[in-house]
Amino acid sequence: MDTRFHCVYLLTSLDPQCAGEYYIGYTVDPIRRLRQHNGEIVSGAWRTKRRGRPWELLCCVSGFGEDRIALKFEWCWQHPTKSTRLKTQMTQLRGVHRLPYAVGVLHLLLRADLFARLQLTLHIFEPEHVGRVVAELQGRVPSIPPLVATSLLRIEEITKERFMSLYLDGVSGGDGTAGDGCVYFVTAPLSSQPEADAPSRRVRSCRYLSEEDIFRQHARVKELLEANQCPCALCSLPLRSPYFVRCSRTPFCTLRAHLACLAMWFTYETMQKRDATMGQSTRNERSGEYSNKIKDDSNDGTMDAHASGRQLHSLSVNNADFSSSRDAGSILDSSGHISAFEESRCASSPSLTLLPSQPCPCPLCDEPLQWGALVHDLKRRAVLEKRWMERQRREKIEAALAERLQRLQNSSLTERKSRRKAKPALGQKRNRGEYCGDTVGDGGKEAITNWRARVMDGCDSWNDTNDFSHSVSLPPSGDEGYACDSSRRGVGGSKHTTRMTDEGKNDSITDICDCVLQLTEFNLDEWLDA
């Protein structure tokens, strides 16, 4: 089902040089379309672009079930003299021009048979301006009465902001009701007819009178619809939400039926009413003819008892034939198919239409049902259902994205912590005991002592590595710590001696100088002998 908002709007020019000019168009968003006509955004109409800016939105008509009906309404409003539904009435608007002419055509169009069956809403955005135009129209054409609200036509004065929040923003279901609330009208009256006309079965069908019972019944019906276990009241086949029609007195009436089933019921009731009217008129005609015949015969004195009895007998036979033919005119025969009498009656009635045009009583509570109101309620529920499903889908997607983002944040935080524990950060100064233990073994101490002795004697520390076969750990401080660190870096001779003598705590300055001289002294005899 098409759940878009279809409307036909009326614009008028605010330019003093174009006073009274109007524009009629179709759209699904009249507020956005008005901005296009005024040039605020692109894709405006060529006719409104040439002259007339700025334009003002006077009113719009909504409630169309699909775009084809709305486009037909727009064409009839734009070309009333070519429309078969208005061209016979356009003589009333002779001498009326510009904006009052457009408003007068709207008055006639909303009363046309085709659109009077639909449940439409007239939204008036500029009540003062429209009031002046209607007053001017009434002064020129008094034969056209002003529009009044009916059971199918709704007239409301509304601002553009309120209109957007109710019909265009998707927050509500098109008539101000919340999308996630109960779709029943809790304060609905038990009946729109007087109590004297209401049959007893209507009272018996009102089982849910408290608000708790109404919501409980709504939840139960919703569960049955979701499980495809809610039957149609006319054919007993399961219904599919939200594509079914219901009585206007829901939940006080339990009628829920398929669209085609209720349309057949409307057609059947229309034919029954037509047959009853035709039968009554036939009886009246025959009884009038018979009474006139008897009166004429009694005045002439020529009618005898035998002729009068024979005529009475023929009249009774004709009445019996008519009643028997009417009793045989049920929709379904014993085999469940449409009877031949109904087929011939449907074929012989040219005024029957596919869509019901007359109100019909509810098969359960006798409440008058308007076909346009039923279809409007069906579309409203379809819009609510669609928006509710979109809202649930959006919430699920947002929840899934939030969960995934949280999972990514947790994993990245854990990874950073593990990396921080695995290796130090760049530029961080290493402690002396980071790679070596705090204590040095006995073998390590002996190797360090031998190495120090060789250094003091002027020997190379890298010539003999047997002393460092044991894995030693650097002490936290002192000479041994420096010796271990120097051996790992592979620094030789003079550097070892210099740093060793500088960092030694027990050596004097004289000993340090002697060590340096021994290492740097050049022996010429040894060099020549070599």
UniProtKB/Swiss-Prot annotation:
Per UniProt, the keywords (alphabetical) are:
DNA damage, DNA recombination, DNA repair, Endonuclease, Hydrolase, Metal-binding, Nuclease, Nucleus, Zinc, Zinc-finger
Compositional bias (Basic and acidic residues) spans?
Answer: 283-298
Which cystines does this chain contain?
A: none
Please state where this protein is localized. Nucleus
Q: Where are the zinc fingers (SLX1-type)?
A: 232-365
Instruction: Give yes or no: UniProt keyword Metal-binding.
Output: yes
Q: What is its EC number?
A: 3.1.-.-
A Pfam family reported for this protein in Swiss-Prot or TrEMBL: GIY-YIG
This protein's cofactor list reads: a divalent metal cation
Asked whether the UniProt record includes Lipid metabolism among its keywords, one would answer no
The protein's matches in Gene3D superfamilies, at most eight in alphabetical order, are given as:
GIY-YIG endonuclease
List, for all copies, the residue spans of the domain called GIY-YIG.
4-89
Q: What class of enzyme is it?
A: hydrolase
| Gene Ontology molecular-function annotations | 5'-flap endonuclease activity; zinc ion binding
Annotated region Disordered: the residues are 276-306, 410-438, 474-502
Q: Which Gene Ontology BP terms does the record give?
A: DNA recombination; DNA repair
Cellular component per GO, a single term: Slx1-Slx4 complex
The entry assigns this protein to a family as follows:
Belongs to the SLX1 family.
| Described purpose of this protein according to its UniProt entry | Catalytic subunit of a heterodimeric structure-specific endonuclease that resolves DNA secondary structures generated during DNA repair and recombination. Has endonuclease activity towards branched DNA substrates, introducing single-strand cuts in duplex DNA close to junctions with ss-DNA.
- Mind telling me which PANTHER family this protein's record contains? STRUCTURE-SPECIFIC ENDONUCLEASE SUBUNIT SLX1
Q: Assembly and partners?
A: Forms a heterodimer with a member of the SLX4 family.
Identify this protein by name: Structure-specific endonuclease subunit SLX1 homolog 2
Lineage, highest ranks first: Eukaryota, Discoba, Euglenozoa, Kinetoplastea, Metakinetoplastina
